């Protein structure tokens, strides 16, 4: 796996462009298990960043609906979803290599073959590698809420990002978000509702019950015990 997780963008004069990122690089120390997984399973399941669009049929060796998960953490729920739906293809993106290693180890242990992972900036991957009208589902679960007001602009869910996701979804594809931060849920709802081309799948036009397809994480279980809420939002591409 290459170490160039984040490639700067350049202007017409070749100068690097600065753009606000929605994450902080916290690479952390790899455990021996994570290191072993990166060395041994990355060649099979890992995808290097490329400037060229990916061909999903070639990448997965078959034609099947593709779900993209952005920021899969340690990968437990992503692996569980891929194992539960072997008829679908899953691509996960995570910027922190310990999480990528943990996901690879878990996928290998569970015998999951319909999963590929990347260690790169998801926005750049969407721009450069994901073909338009190619995804059946985009998942964004528990992104950093950047709860301080001065940091709100760092939240990944902003109008340009949501419009980018829209362009990558097939007609009828769904953008599924979840957060345990109510103010961020309200922000997500406001952003998504402002974009022509999305339809809110909530009967009350706000949030949906957690679908069975999204596993409950340990983090989420702990939150429930402490009385914390979780908000799911699902928006379908309709035009």
Swiss-Prot record:
<comment type="function">
    <text>Catalyzes the formation of N(7)-methylguanine at position 46 (m7G46) in tRNA.</text>
</comment>
<dbReference type="InterPro" id="IPR003358">
    <property type="entry name" value="tRNA_(Gua-N-7)_MeTrfase_Trmb"/>
</dbReference>
<feature type="region of interest" description="Interaction with RNA">
    <location>
        <begin position="150"/>
        <end position="155"/>
    </location>
</feature>
<feature type="binding site">
    <location>
        <begin position="217"/>
        <end position="220"/>
    </location>
    <ligand>
        <name>substrate</name>
    </ligand>
</feature>
<keyword id="KW-0949">S-adenosyl-L-methionine</keyword>
<feature type="binding site">
    <location>
        <position position="144"/>
    </location>
    <ligand>
        <name>S-adenosyl-L-methionine</name>
    </ligand>
</feature>
<feature type="active site">
    <location>
        <position position="144"/>
    </location>
</feature>
<feature type="binding site">
    <location>
        <position position="121"/>
    </location>
    <ligand>
        <name>S-adenosyl-L-methionine</name>
    </ligand>
</feature>
<keyword id="KW-0819">tRNA processing</keyword>
<dbReference type="GO" id="GO:0008176">
    <property type="term" value="F:tRNA (guanine(46)-N7)-methyltransferase activity"/>
</dbReference>
<dbReference type="InterPro" id="IPR029063">
    <property type="entry name" value="SAM-dependent_MTases_sf"/>
</dbReference>
<keyword id="KW-0489">Methyltransferase</keyword>
<comment type="similarity">
    <text>Belongs to the class I-like SAM-binding methyltransferase superfamily. TrmB family.</text>
</comment>
<protein>
    <recommendedName>
        <fullName>tRNA (guanine-N(7)-)-methyltransferase</fullName>
        <ecNumber>2.1.1.33</ecNumber>
    </recommendedName>
</protein>
<feature type="binding site">
    <location>
        <position position="180"/>
    </location>
    <ligand>
        <name>substrate</name>
    </ligand>
</feature>
<feature type="binding site">
    <location>
        <position position="69"/>
    </location>
    <ligand>
        <name>S-adenosyl-L-methionine</name>
    </ligand>
</feature>
<keyword id="KW-0808">Transferase</keyword>
<feature type="binding site">
    <location>
        <position position="148"/>
    </location>
    <ligand>
        <name>substrate</name>
    </ligand>
</feature>
<dbReference type="Pfam" id="PF02390">
    <property type="entry name" value="Methyltransf_4"/>
</dbReference>
<comment type="pathway">
    <text>tRNA modification; N(7)-methylguanine-tRNA biosynthesis.</text>
</comment>
<comment type="subunit">
    <text>Monomer.</text>
</comment>
<dbReference type="InterPro" id="IPR055361">
    <property type="entry name" value="tRNA_methyltr_TrmB_bact"/>
</dbReference>
<feature type="binding site">
    <location>
        <position position="94"/>
    </location>
    <ligand>
        <name>S-adenosyl-L-methionine</name>
    </ligand>
</feature>
<dbReference type="GO" id="GO:0043527">
    <property type="term" value="C:tRNA methyltransferase complex"/>
</dbReference>
